[in-house]
């Protein structure tokens, strides 16, 4: 019998190792979209993407956001970042949330305001100050409110074939291609623009509640103590100046 629920990830480049779920859970298919032809897994169905028409980070986001284009044969989907270990049957979460909502994600662990997150992105060097300011100024002109909410966006649970979700995901992808490439900065605005609010799930990669475990990115794992110390000092100085 064909499953109607798929857990999927996207891994382009060598940013992360592919982490197998703890087991192949009943009622779930597991798919990994990747450009790495030698990638192997005991659980993930490896689907090689040959047409790389965007920078690798945007290829990841393309598959992350536009699930209706690549997984239309499934009714429900859960996207997980490649550095998240699935520790329990995610179908239980789909049954818990997608019977009530079309789109659910973990709440951001630290902030609920895109404007605050934008400042943090600049401080951490994740976005350029001029581009980020331009994006936030545009949102202010549109009267997008502060503290509208924020998802962590590393887990996305969706009924991805509904017209509403297709419209939201299409808008989100277009916004990401015209503004900064931080998807957390654009999603809240897109939800607001579509007269939708955040629906949060209790389970997250940071507070797994038995379902998820967050694994450090390769880049973070490979940094020396002095590299980490230098980064922290740089951030402290930026906080004073910014």
Which stretches of residues belong to each language-model region?
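N-terminal anchoring/stem segment of glycosyltransferases
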Residues: 1-61, 70-73, 178-181, 193-195, ...
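Catalytic phosphate/metal-binding cores of nucleic-acid and nucleotide-processing enzymes, i.e., regions
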Residues: 5, 22, 97-98, 138
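A conserved donor-nucleotide-binding helix/loop in the catalytic core
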Residues: 53-78, 88, 92, 186
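Short acidic (Asp/Glu) patches
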Residues: 59-66, 92, 121-141
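The conserved acidic donor/metal-binding loop of glycosyltransferases
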Residues: 81-85
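Conserved donor-nucleotide/metal-binding helix-loop-beta segment in metal-dependent transferases, i.e.
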Residues: 87-121
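Catalytic core and acceptor-binding pocket of nucleotide-sugar-dependent glycosyltransferases
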Residues: 127-220
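Low-complexity, charge- and small-residue-enriched intrinsically disordered regions
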Residues: 234-242
